[in-house]
């Protein structure tokens, strides 16, 4: 089995890990309700995307409320 010939220095270790950092998500403002949303995603507050309503947020909220009420 192969073994490292020399100990890796901190500089080489850091250079290898230079590309491992996470980037912040691309957050933009919803033009409809001005809440923060992910780009290229429907708004989770008002349910619009590209100027159209694509998600019925009220129906989803009601469904969640009914589901949680039934589990009690």
From Swiss-Prot:
SUPFAM superfamilies: Zn-binding ribosomal proteins (SSF57829). GO terms for cellular component: large ribosomal subunit. One of its GO terms (biological process) is translation. GO terms for molecular function: structural constituent of ribosome. Coiled coil: none annotated. Keywords: Ribonucleoprotein, Ribosomal protein. Belongs to the bacterial ribosomal protein bL32 family. This is Large ribosomal subunit protein bL32. It comes from Dehalococcoides mccartyi (strain ATCC BAA-2266 / KCTC 15142 / 195). The lineage of its organism: Bacteria, Bacillati, Chloroflexota, Dehalococcoidia, Dehalococcoidales. The gene is rpmF.
């Amino acid at each position: 089995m192969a073994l490292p010939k020399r100990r890796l220095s901190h500089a080489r270790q850091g250079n290898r890990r230079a590309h491992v950092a996470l980037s912040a998500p691309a957050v933009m403002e919803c033009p409809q309700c001005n809440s923060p949303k992910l780009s290229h995603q429907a708004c989770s507050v008002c349910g619009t995307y590209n100027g159209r309503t694509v998600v019925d947020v009220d129906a989803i909220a009601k469904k969640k409320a009914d589901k949680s009420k039934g589990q009690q």
